[in-house]
Amino acid sequence: TWSEFTEVLKKVQPVVEKKKGYALDMTFPTGEATIYYYAPFFWSNGGDFVSKDGLKVNGVFNSKENLETVNYFKSFLDNGYMSKVQITDLFESGRAAFKFDGAWEVNTIYNNYPDVNLGVAPYVVSDNWDGGRYTPTGSWAFAASSKTKKLKGATKLVQWMSGVESGKRLWDESKSFPSTYEAFESSPIFEEDENYKALYHQLSKYGHPRSKTPVYPQVSASVQEVLENSVLTDKDAKTELDKSVERINAKLKRYVMK
């Protein structure tokens, strides 16, 4: 839980400080990475970013649950557990105890940092977690253009690319996770390797899709901006959440106007 994780950070901080490091290797990069890495914190605390129909953000994006989550992140910097600026290879060099990253990081470390004693931990959940799904999902997607002249063939290709055999090949060639249970279960590594086994367990048991909304790009960018502005530049979290609602609403107008 959040409170348990905070206690762990307190204990490891003196150790990594001797190496001129931090307890956490944690950044808020632009693009899709930030919402992918940190949405689980919001979800496990009972928060979300848009309404179920994807057309409302006021009272959702700026909810009290989301404010609590942002303030929890702020406590990391306030207590010196993370750096205000990105430090290259902080975790990989042994100067950070924890790193938030995608499943692909396991393969990166196996190949490039074989001396790192890597362990995958479950996502940290809120003390208010109700046991629901909270782990981020999603990767490559395949689709046919609405203007394709070969719809039947394109449909078959998308079906194959989204299926078992394609998933197994994607894993073998690129280490991108499959999208079907059968593909996972046909690859022994997801049982034999403890880190990949832990990742599969998280995905299969707690996988949570990101928000479905016509203004998803604005939602994703706003999550990144709120965390960067609130945590790294110490702006008021509630003000930043409310500003994001205004920005997203400006884009939502075209979809909700009658």
Task: List each language-model region with its residue ranges.
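Extracytoplasmic/periplasmic solute-binding protein
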Residues: 3-58, 96
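Glycine-centered hinge/linker elements that transmit conformational signals in sensory
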Residues: 6-11, 53-84
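Short, well-structured alpha-helical segments that form the helix of a local strand-helix-strand
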Residues: 6-9, 91, 237-249
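Short helices/loops that flank or line small-molecule/ion binding pockets
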Residues: 7-11, 85-99, 225, 229-232
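Bilobed periplasmic-binding protein-like "clamshell/Venus-flytrap" ligand-binding domains
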Residues: 14-30, 83, 163-174, 250-258
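Extracytoplasmic/periplasmic substrate-recognition and gating elements
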Residues: 64-67, 71, 78-82, 111-176, ...
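Paired acidic/hydrophobic, glycine-rich loop segments that form the ligand-binding mouth/hinge
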Residues: 97-102, 119-121
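Long, aromatic- and glycine/proline-rich binding clefts that accommodate carbohydrate-like moieties
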Residues: 114, 121-122, 172-229, 254-257
